[in-house]
Amino acid sequence: MSLKPPVSEKDHLQGDKNAPIELVEYGDYQCPHCGRAYPIIKSIQKKLGNKLKFVFRNFPLAESHPDAVNAAIATEAAAVQGKFWEMHDAVFEHQRDLSDAALIKCAQKVGLDISKFESDFDKQEIQDKVESDLESGVRSGVNGTPSFFINGKKYNDSWDEDTLLEYLRSISV
């Protein structure tokens, strides 16, 4: 399966936008597997440096993870203030409690204007961004989280750090 749509300016991107390796994760902030993948991706980003661009797309599995949608909306609301990645990290680092009160604490921790955050949280376009990510995942063949795409193609191998890093290094040569 291929990534639909391809990465664009609408995505949240870390790293060099012209990097030779593009890693896209469809993730759910409440998913324990995504929680385990989070430090692995951070480590891989450090090891590959400017050879890697990383994109995160929301894929909340609401039936299994009742707080996942609100957590995704919270990160998108933080993006309005230019703090998507800070909120992304804070939410994963506090994954055990994603209640509304906990999300407000995360927003405070990353220095958001809380009244603006709360206002943006309720905006339809923020909810639409989460829904758009989810729909793109469905079109791309995502059926669980985390799901990874490397240079536009679905990655189906193990995502333990050694295996994923070895694969990424093999394609960057």
Predicted segments — roles?
Residues 13-14, 98, 155:
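Short clusters of hydrophobic/aromatic residues that line enzyme substrate/ligand-binding pockets
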Residues 2, 7-9, 116, 150:
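Residue-level signal for pocket-adjacent positions within structured domains
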Residues 1-5, 170-173:
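N-terminal targeting signals for export/organelle localization
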Residues 4-21:
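A short beta-strand-turn-helix
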Residues 26, 33-46, 105-173:
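C-terminal cap of thioredoxin/glutaredoxin-like
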Residues 17-19, 50, 144:
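Residue-level preference for short coil/turn positions at secondary-structure junctions
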